[in-house]
């Protein structure tokens, strides 16, 4: 990650409106990963990441920041929900599985990079296999291949293959047979299932089977097979583990849902126990994965929660100490809603315009129409449950319902969505609190 904090914030601004503090905190944390890697080895081990706790109501951009960050980071990244985990010893996923899943993500990322690096060599080998099927090499009476006879023809076919002229021709090829092993285990033991499957698949002898397919599909299959031959699995494992340990990022959503609210007695397997299990992973421990042992000392953890019922102080004191950077995300205003409808690269109004354009219907949202949509969403949020920007999806779906249904019969029309159009479509629902509670 060589992007500066300003560049990271600018990239996030293209998709997320407002929340400057959260964007800055995330950008600094991401840049610090790069800064740390420039330090001498002995000092690098001492610099630990400053984990982040994002606090804010639902629908203000916490999860969206995580999604966009994953694309920017180009590093092993996983987003999980705290409510999915249970305390060790109970049925359900253990928190260690976060690191195992992160290692799997890293392995996939490293494999993709290795395949990309060897793409040219793999492409040539895959093309040779296709050409061997199309033009079996001529052999002399002793079984030796005579290359000179059909070399020019082979080059002609290779040119046609690269230009896509042979894409739809069907051929029969030998492909590696995938051995599928189905293992039934009780709920919460998915990790054991995947390990047993890997074990049995590794023990079974590699076989090939003949398959008939189009050349363009065969080329993809062979490209994957040839690329797999060019990479060293052991090297990949080492690179994947190093990538997790040095650059891994874990985003834990809904952390407020595992807080112990007030004086509560009795078994509570999904709350305080999960917090206790999270402590060693965030602080730094070693987790056994199928790719090897992973140290979590330098993995960056970003936690988020609405904290509408519980408060950050309801978290275990030890866990609070391991999340030193606190960022509060603000509730969205009517002006924020207007910007969300128009400013992001794939804004909601743009999505609807392009969707209707496929039916030959032109949609135009006027400025006063957008203002009225934003006002309607904001008012419904105030009067009922505040679900932030997600309310815009509900309001727009209600507004576009008739157009979406009749679009195929209105080809060639231009529909202008102005203040009057929005008022007619939404007024009854917005004004009636009981209706808006159930419909919007």
UniProtKB/Swiss-Prot annotation:
It is found in: Cytoplasm. GO terms for molecular function: ATP binding; ATP hydrolysis activity; peptidase activity; proteasome-activating activity. This is ATP-dependent protease ATPase subunit HslU. A double ring-shaped homohexamer of HslV is capped on each side by a ring-shaped HslU homohexamer. The assembly of the HslU/HslV complex is dependent on binding of ATP. Residues 143-155 have a biased composition (Polar residues). ATPase subunit of a proteasome-like degradation complex; this subunit has chaperone activity. The binding of ATP and its subsequent hydrolysis by HslU are essential for unfolding of protein substrates subsequently hydrolyzed by HslV. HslU recognizes the N-terminal part of its protein substrates and unfolds these before they are guided to HslV for hydrolysis. GO terms for biological process: protein unfolding; proteolysis involved in protein catabolic process. The keyword Ubl conjugation does not apply. It comes from Mannheimia haemolytica. The gene is hslU. Its main location: cytoplasm. HAMAP family: HslU.
